C-alpha cells in the first residue's frame, strides 16, 4: 500500500502550467499542495526539470540541450539536483505561504538566504545581443546543479519586491497553487478560471 501511495504522488505525464506570473511561483506550482500533503509531483526526472525550466523561459533551447548532456555525463549529480529541486520547492512553498498569511518563517528564510549567498557566487554580467549588459551565469549548464541558480535568483527578486503584496493562493479545492494577482481590481481568485474556477462552479451546481 505504501508503495502504491508513493507512486500516486508522482505525475510524470501531467503538463506544466505557467500561470503564476513569475517563474519562481510556477516552480512551486509543479506540484499540488493539498490538505493531505503534496500530490501530483511533476518533477519525476531531471529531464522533466529541464523541460520545466525551458518552458518557464529560464533556459533557451541550446542551454536545455547542454543540461541534458550534463545529466548524461553526471547521472548521480543529476539525480541529486532533482532531490535538491524538490527540497527547494518545499522551502519556497513555505516562504510564499508565509507571505500570503502574514506569518513569519525565520528558519525557511535563513535556509533560503544561504541558497541565495551560494548562488550569487555564480552570477555574472554578460553581453546580450545588441551589446546591452544583462545578468548571466558562470558556466550555466556545465553541471546539473547549476539549473537551480536562475530559480533561486528569481525567487529572491520576487520576495524582495512589492509584488509580494499581490501574491495569492488559489481558492480551488486541492490546488494550493500560488499566483501574482495583476488583475485590474486585484480580485482574482483562481490559478486559472478555466480549471479551478470552473471546477468550483460545477461543485456548487451539483450541491443545489
Model-derived segments and spans:
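Short helix-coil boundary/hinge micro-motifs
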Residues: 1-168, 176
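BZIP DNA-binding basic region
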Residues: 147-208
Amino acid at each position: 500500500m505504501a508503495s502504491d501511495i508513493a507512486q500516486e504522488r508522482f505525475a510524470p505525464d501531467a503538463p506544466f502550467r505557467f500561470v503564476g506570473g513569475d517563474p519562481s511561483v510556477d516552480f512551486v506550482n509543479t506540484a499540488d499542495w493539498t490538505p493531505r500533503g503534496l500530490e501530483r509531483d511533476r518533477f519525476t526526472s531531471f529531464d522533466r526539470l529541464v523541460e520545466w525550466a525551458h518552458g518557464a523561459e529560464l533556459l533557451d533551447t541550446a542551454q536545455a540541450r547542454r543540461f541534458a548532456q550534463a545529466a548524461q555525463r553526471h547521472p548521480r549529480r543529476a539525480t541529486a539536483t532533482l532531490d535538491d529541486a524538490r527540497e527547494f520547492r518545499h522551502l519556497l512553498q513555505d516562504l510564499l505561504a508565509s507571505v500570503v498569511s502574514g506569518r513569519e518563517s525565520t528558519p525557511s528564510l535563513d535556509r533560503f538566504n544561504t541558497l541565495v549567498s551560494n548562488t550569487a557566487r555564480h552570477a555574472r554580467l554578460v553581453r546580450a545581443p545588441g551589446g546591452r549588459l544583462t545578468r548571466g551565469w558562470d558556466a550555466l549548464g556545465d553541471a546539473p546543479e547549476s539549473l537551480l541558480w536562475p530559480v533561486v535568483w528569481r525567487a529572491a527578486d520576487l520576495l524582495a519586491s512589492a509584488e509580494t503584496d499581490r501574491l495569492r493562493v488559489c481558492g480551488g479545492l486541492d490546488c494550493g497553487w500560488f499566483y501574482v494577482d495583476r488583475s485590474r481590481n486585484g480580485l482574482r481568485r483562481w490559478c486559472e478560471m478555466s480549471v479551478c474556477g470552473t471546477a468550483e462552479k460545477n461543485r456548487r451546481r451539483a450541491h443545489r
